[in-house]
Regions:
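Structured-RNA-binding interfaces characteristic of tRNA pseudouridine synthases
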Residues: 13-178
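Short Gly/Ser/Thr- and charged-rich N-terminal loops/segments
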Residues: 5
Protein backbone atom coordinates (compact mmCIF):
# COMPACT_ATOMS: atom_id res chain seq x y z
CA UNK A 1 0.00 0.00 0.00
CA UNK A 2 1.33 3.43 -0.96
CA UNK A 3 1.24 6.39 1.36
CA UNK A 4 0.05 9.68 -0.12
CA UNK A 5 1.47 12.99 1.03
CA UNK A 6 -1.07 15.76 0.80
CA UNK A 7 -0.46 18.12 -2.10
CA UNK A 8 2.35 15.98 -3.47
CA UNK A 9 1.24 12.71 -5.03
CA UNK A 10 -1.52 12.22 -7.54
CA UNK A 11 -4.21 9.84 -6.24
CA UNK A 12 -4.40 8.16 -9.65
CA UNK A 13 -1.27 6.18 -8.78
CA UNK A 14 -3.10 4.34 -6.04
CA UNK A 15 -6.81 4.18 -6.80
CA UNK A 16 -7.33 4.18 -10.56
CA UNK A 17 -5.99 2.76 -13.78
CA UNK A 18 -3.77 5.61 -14.83
CA UNK A 19 -3.53 7.35 -18.19
CA UNK A 20 -0.13 8.60 -19.35
CA UNK A 21 0.19 11.84 -21.30
CA UNK A 22 2.93 13.50 -23.33
CA UNK A 23 2.80 17.27 -22.82
CA UNK A 24 4.86 19.57 -25.05
CA UNK A 25 5.85 22.89 -23.47
CA UNK A 26 7.96 25.91 -24.39
CA UNK A 27 9.66 28.21 -21.93
CA UNK A 28 12.00 31.13 -21.55
CA UNK A 29 14.28 30.02 -18.74
CA UNK A 30 15.65 33.41 -17.69
CA UNK A 31 13.73 33.43 -14.40
CA UNK A 32 14.26 29.76 -13.53
CA UNK A 33 16.95 27.60 -11.98
CA UNK A 34 16.49 25.00 -14.72
CA UNK A 35 13.81 22.41 -15.38
CA UNK A 36 14.20 20.00 -12.46
CA UNK A 37 12.65 20.90 -9.09
CA UNK A 38 15.19 22.38 -6.67
CA UNK A 39 14.67 23.59 -3.11
CA UNK A 40 16.57 26.87 -3.56
CA UNK A 41 15.24 28.26 -6.85
CA UNK A 42 12.04 28.54 -8.87
CA UNK A 43 12.02 25.89 -11.60
CA UNK A 44 10.04 25.19 -14.75
CA UNK A 45 8.90 21.79 -13.44
CA UNK A 46 7.59 23.30 -10.19
CA UNK A 47 5.64 25.94 -12.13
CA UNK A 48 4.13 23.26 -14.39
CA UNK A 49 3.22 21.11 -11.38
CA UNK A 50 1.64 24.12 -9.64
CA UNK A 51 -0.56 24.68 -12.71
CA UNK A 52 -1.40 20.97 -12.89
CA UNK A 53 -2.42 20.94 -9.24
CA UNK A 54 -4.81 23.84 -9.82
CA UNK A 55 -6.31 22.26 -12.95
CA UNK A 56 -6.24 18.54 -12.16
CA UNK A 57 -6.65 18.66 -8.39
CA UNK A 58 -3.47 16.65 -7.86
CA UNK A 59 0.26 17.12 -8.41
CA UNK A 60 1.43 14.44 -10.87
CA UNK A 61 5.01 13.24 -10.91
CA UNK A 62 6.39 14.92 -14.05
CA UNK A 63 9.18 13.33 -16.12
CA UNK A 64 11.05 15.76 -18.38
CA UNK A 65 12.87 14.74 -21.55
CA UNK A 66 16.05 16.35 -20.23
CA UNK A 67 17.43 18.61 -17.56
CA UNK A 68 18.14 22.19 -18.47
CA UNK A 69 20.42 24.55 -16.61
CA UNK A 70 19.48 27.87 -15.08
CA UNK A 71 18.59 30.46 -17.71
CA UNK A 72 18.25 27.95 -20.57
CA UNK A 73 15.23 28.27 -22.87
CA UNK A 74 13.31 25.51 -24.66
CA UNK A 75 11.15 25.91 -27.76
CA UNK A 76 9.76 22.36 -27.62
CA UNK A 77 10.31 20.36 -24.44
CA UNK A 78 8.58 17.02 -23.82
CA UNK A 79 7.35 15.86 -20.45
CA UNK A 80 5.23 12.91 -19.39
CA UNK A 81 2.86 12.44 -16.49
CA UNK A 82 0.07 10.13 -15.37
CA UNK A 83 -3.44 11.22 -14.51
CA UNK A 84 -6.92 9.80 -14.26
CA UNK A 85 -9.63 12.28 -13.56
CA UNK A 86 -12.42 14.32 -15.02
CA UNK A 87 -10.44 16.91 -17.00
CA UNK A 88 -10.36 15.77 -20.65
CA UNK A 89 -7.02 15.96 -22.46
CA UNK A 90 -8.42 18.34 -25.09
CA UNK A 91 -9.06 20.95 -22.37
CA UNK A 92 -5.75 20.59 -20.51
CA UNK A 93 -3.52 22.83 -22.66
CA UNK A 94 -5.78 25.85 -22.37
CA UNK A 95 -6.42 25.18 -18.68
CA UNK A 96 -2.70 24.77 -17.88
CA UNK A 97 -1.87 28.00 -19.75
CA UNK A 98 -4.44 29.88 -17.66
CA UNK A 99 -2.36 29.00 -14.57
CA UNK A 100 1.18 29.09 -15.98
CA UNK A 101 3.36 32.20 -15.90
CA UNK A 102 3.65 33.95 -19.30
CA UNK A 103 7.20 32.66 -19.85
CA UNK A 104 6.01 29.02 -19.83
CA UNK A 105 3.41 27.73 -22.31
CA UNK A 106 1.77 24.35 -22.77
CA UNK A 107 1.68 23.64 -26.52
CA UNK A 108 -0.08 20.32 -27.04
CA UNK A 109 -0.89 17.09 -25.25
CA UNK A 110 -1.24 13.50 -26.43
CA UNK A 111 -2.24 10.28 -24.67
CA UNK A 112 0.62 7.76 -24.88
CA UNK A 113 1.37 4.21 -23.77
CA UNK A 114 1.27 3.68 -20.00
CA UNK A 115 5.01 2.90 -19.85
CA UNK A 116 6.02 6.01 -21.86
CA UNK A 117 8.78 8.08 -20.24
CA UNK A 118 9.77 11.40 -21.83
CA UNK A 119 13.47 11.08 -20.99
CA UNK A 120 13.90 7.55 -22.32
CA UNK A 121 11.84 8.27 -25.44
CA UNK A 122 13.99 11.26 -26.44
CA UNK A 123 16.17 10.26 -29.38
CA UNK A 124 17.67 13.63 -30.28
CA UNK A 125 18.21 17.12 -28.93
CA UNK A 126 18.89 20.26 -30.91
CA UNK A 127 20.78 23.16 -29.40
CA UNK A 128 20.90 26.63 -30.93
CA UNK A 129 23.38 29.29 -29.95
CA UNK A 130 22.95 32.84 -31.19
CA UNK A 131 25.76 35.35 -31.70
CA UNK A 132 25.07 39.04 -32.14
CA UNK A 133 28.02 40.61 -33.95
CA UNK A 134 27.60 44.24 -32.89
CA UNK A 135 29.27 46.85 -30.75
CA UNK A 136 26.12 47.43 -28.69
CA UNK A 137 23.63 44.97 -27.19
CA UNK A 138 20.23 44.70 -28.84
CA UNK A 139 17.60 45.44 -26.18
CA UNK A 140 15.32 42.78 -27.68
CA UNK A 141 17.86 39.93 -27.69
CA UNK A 142 20.38 40.78 -24.95
CA UNK A 143 19.25 37.84 -22.82
CA UNK A 144 19.10 35.29 -25.65
CA UNK A 145 22.25 36.11 -27.64
CA UNK A 146 25.95 36.27 -26.94
CA UNK A 147 27.24 39.63 -28.13
CA UNK A 148 30.68 39.63 -29.73
CA UNK A 149 31.94 43.18 -30.21
CA UNK A 150 34.92 42.89 -32.57
CA UNK A 151 34.20 41.97 -36.17
CA UNK A 152 34.01 38.21 -36.59
CA UNK A 153 36.13 36.34 -39.15
CA UNK A 154 33.19 34.68 -40.91
CA UNK A 155 35.40 32.70 -43.33
CA UNK A 156 37.34 31.15 -40.43
CA UNK A 157 34.08 30.37 -38.63
CA UNK A 158 32.63 28.67 -41.72
CA UNK A 159 35.79 26.59 -42.13
CA UNK A 160 35.61 25.52 -38.49
CA UNK A 161 31.89 24.72 -38.80
CA UNK A 162 32.65 22.25 -41.61
CA UNK A 163 34.25 19.99 -39.01
CA UNK A 164 30.87 19.66 -37.24
CA UNK A 165 28.92 18.57 -40.33
CA UNK A 166 27.78 14.95 -40.23
CA UNK A 167 26.82 12.41 -37.62
CA UNK A 168 28.99 12.14 -34.55
CA UNK A 169 29.01 9.78 -31.57
CA UNK A 170 28.97 11.73 -28.30
CA UNK A 171 28.35 8.66 -26.12
CA UNK A 172 31.62 9.28 -24.28
CA UNK A 173 30.17 12.58 -23.02
CA UNK A 174 27.03 10.93 -21.56
CA UNK A 175 26.62 9.98 -17.93
CA UNK A 176 27.22 6.31 -17.24
CA UNK A 177 24.07 4.25 -17.79
CA UNK A 178 22.12 7.04 -19.49
Amino acid sequence: SKTLRAGNACPCYVFCKRMTYLLWIAYKGTNYGGFQVQPNAPTVCAAVQDAMQRVLGCRPDVKGCSRTDAGVHARRFALSFCYTGKVPAEKMVQAFNAHLPPDIRALEIWPVAENFHARYAAHAKTYRYYILNARVDDPFTFDTCCRIGPELDVAAMQAAAERFVGTHDFLALCASGS
